[in-house]
Swiss-Prot record:
Gene3D superfamilies: 2.40.160.20. It is found in: Cell outer membrane. Belongs to the lipid A palmitoyltransferase family. GO terms for cellular component: cell outer membrane. Keywords: Acyltransferase, Cell outer membrane, Membrane, Signal, Transferase. Homodimer. It comes from Musicola paradisiaca (strain Ech703). The keyword Zinc does not apply. Its EC number is 2.3.1.251. This is Lipid A acyltransferase PagP.
Amino acid sequence: MWLRFCAPALMAWYWVFFPSTSQAATMENDGQDGFWQRAKNNLSETWHNGQSQDLYVPAMTWHNRWTYSRQKIDKYNERPWGAGYGVSRLDSDGDWHGIYLMAFKDSFNKWEPIGGYGYEKRWKPVAGNDDFQLGLGFTAGVTMRDNWNYIPIPVLLPLASINYQRLSFQMTYIPGTHNNGNVYFAWLRWQL
């Protein structure tokens, strides 16, 4: 049953990551690409020409205390044990692109895999110091949760980071309603 949901996504990922010669040729044009073509180009460039391999270590989960009852918070796991792996690169503007796969213990202490693409516009807030950077962007991918029978669920979330040399503290916020969603999730990313 899950294959019915995954097959279209798997075919699309295959097409992006393993383009035919004719598809690869269409990626090289005069820079007048639309959003979809730029996204495919960035995914393909990151996959084929990643500058670093990355280790992901989930660091914390925080359920927003203004949107959750104390009973719910007391039942939830906020220590997301797990790990992940990815490839990443910096583009000509110094912006970060990454493709990742991570698995961690979710709020119910069940395994949750997530995989996708991340983009961050990078800034160097301290003049003359290229080692320290801040990032702001998004991540788009697919996750699967135990409480949803591990059906693939697409995600599009904000992404922010604090970076120093090869270490990044990345974070996102999952929006939601009362007692649902509204979760801050953070992880460490180490460039190997």
